[in-house]
Protein backbone atom coordinates (compact mmCIF):
# COMPACT_ATOMS: atom_id res chain seq x y z
CA UNK A 1 0.00 0.00 0.00
CA UNK A 2 1.22 3.52 -0.76
CA UNK A 3 1.25 6.29 1.84
CA UNK A 4 2.19 9.98 1.57
CA UNK A 5 3.81 11.66 4.58
CA UNK A 6 1.99 14.83 5.61
CA UNK A 7 3.76 15.72 8.88
CA UNK A 8 6.46 14.37 11.15
CA UNK A 9 7.56 14.68 14.78
CA UNK A 10 10.72 13.77 16.66
CA UNK A 11 10.65 12.52 20.26
CA UNK A 12 14.06 13.37 21.74
CA UNK A 13 13.36 11.64 25.07
CA UNK A 14 12.75 8.22 23.44
CA UNK A 15 14.80 8.51 20.24
CA UNK A 16 11.73 7.66 18.15
CA UNK A 17 9.68 9.39 15.46
CA UNK A 18 6.05 9.92 14.51
CA UNK A 19 4.74 10.42 10.97
CA UNK A 20 1.25 11.38 9.84
CA UNK A 21 0.59 9.47 6.61
CA UNK A 22 -2.38 9.27 4.25
CA UNK A 23 -3.39 6.80 1.56
CA UNK A 24 -5.01 7.45 -1.82
CA UNK A 25 -8.34 6.57 -0.19
CA UNK A 26 -7.76 9.30 2.43
CA UNK A 27 -7.11 6.80 5.22
CA UNK A 28 -4.84 8.57 7.72
CA UNK A 29 -2.56 6.95 10.26
CA UNK A 30 0.01 8.08 12.79
CA UNK A 31 3.07 5.84 12.55
CA UNK A 32 5.32 5.56 15.58
CA UNK A 33 8.68 4.22 14.45
CA UNK A 34 12.38 3.97 15.18
CA UNK A 35 15.33 3.54 12.91
CA UNK A 36 18.17 5.24 11.12
CA UNK A 37 16.06 7.13 8.57
CA UNK A 38 13.97 10.24 9.22
CA UNK A 39 10.75 10.26 7.17
CA UNK A 40 9.92 13.78 5.94
CA UNK A 41 6.90 15.60 4.50
CA UNK A 42 6.21 14.48 0.95
CA UNK A 43 8.03 11.15 1.25
CA UNK A 44 6.22 8.16 -0.26
CA UNK A 45 6.05 4.98 1.83
CA UNK A 46 5.21 1.62 0.32
CA UNK A 47 4.40 -1.29 2.60
CA UNK A 48 4.11 -4.95 1.73
CA UNK A 49 5.69 -8.37 2.13
CA UNK A 50 9.09 -6.72 1.50
CA UNK A 51 8.75 -4.43 4.52
CA UNK A 52 8.82 -0.65 4.16
CA UNK A 53 10.25 1.26 1.21
CA UNK A 54 10.59 5.03 1.28
CA UNK A 55 10.73 6.82 -2.05
CA UNK A 56 11.41 3.46 -3.72
CA UNK A 57 14.32 2.48 -1.48
CA UNK A 58 14.46 0.03 1.41
CA UNK A 59 15.16 1.88 4.65
CA UNK A 60 16.07 0.66 8.10
CA UNK A 61 12.96 1.53 10.10
CA UNK A 62 10.80 -0.45 12.50
CA UNK A 63 7.17 0.55 12.91
CA UNK A 64 6.38 0.29 16.61
CA UNK A 65 2.68 1.09 16.34
CA UNK A 66 0.13 2.57 13.92
CA UNK A 67 -2.67 4.72 15.34
CA UNK A 68 -5.78 5.87 13.47
CA UNK A 69 -5.29 9.61 12.92
CA UNK A 70 -6.97 11.83 15.47
CA UNK A 71 -6.13 15.57 15.53
CA UNK A 72 -6.32 15.69 19.33
CA UNK A 73 -3.88 12.78 19.65
CA UNK A 74 -1.46 14.35 17.12
CA UNK A 75 -1.57 17.70 18.94
CA UNK A 76 -1.00 15.94 22.27
CA UNK A 77 2.09 14.23 20.86
CA UNK A 78 3.32 17.54 19.44
CA UNK A 79 2.79 19.49 22.66
CA UNK A 80 4.57 16.92 24.84
CA UNK A 81 7.70 16.56 22.67
CA UNK A 82 10.16 19.33 23.37
CA UNK A 83 12.06 19.60 20.09
CA UNK A 84 12.48 22.96 18.31
CA UNK A 85 12.42 21.20 14.92
CA UNK A 86 8.88 19.98 15.54
CA UNK A 87 7.79 23.64 15.50
CA UNK A 88 9.61 24.28 12.19
CA UNK A 89 12.20 26.46 13.93
CA UNK A 90 14.95 25.12 11.70
CA UNK A 91 17.18 28.19 11.80
CA UNK A 92 17.54 28.12 15.56
CA UNK A 93 20.00 26.45 17.88
CA UNK A 94 18.86 23.68 20.21
CA UNK A 95 19.16 24.19 23.95
CA UNK A 96 17.88 20.65 24.66
CA UNK A 97 20.74 18.68 23.09
CA UNK A 98 21.97 17.32 26.44
CA UNK A 99 18.69 15.49 27.06
CA UNK A 100 18.20 14.36 23.44
CA UNK A 101 18.83 10.69 22.59
CA UNK A 102 19.68 11.46 18.94
CA UNK A 103 23.43 11.64 18.27
CA UNK A 104 22.72 13.72 15.16
CA UNK A 105 19.66 15.98 15.04
CA UNK A 106 17.14 14.67 12.47
CA UNK A 107 16.30 18.28 11.63
CA UNK A 108 19.95 19.32 11.34
CA UNK A 109 19.72 21.84 14.19
CA UNK A 110 23.00 22.62 15.92
CA UNK A 111 23.32 22.36 19.70
CA UNK A 112 23.42 25.70 21.52
CA UNK A 113 27.00 26.77 22.21
CA UNK A 114 27.59 27.81 25.79
What name fits each language-model region?
Residues 50-62:
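Short, Lys/Arg- and Gly-enriched loop/turn segments at beta-strand edges
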Residues 1-13:
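Structural detector for short beta-strands of small beta-barrel domains
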Residues 22-28, 80, 87:
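Short solvent-exposed strand/turn elements
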Residues 61-114:
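Glycine- and charge-enriched low-complexity intrinsically disordered segments
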Residues 14-20:
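Short aromatic-glycine-enriched beta-strand elements
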Amino acid sequence: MEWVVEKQLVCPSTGTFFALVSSARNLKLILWYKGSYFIRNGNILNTGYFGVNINGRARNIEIIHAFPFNPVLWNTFKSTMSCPGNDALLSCECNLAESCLFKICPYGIRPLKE
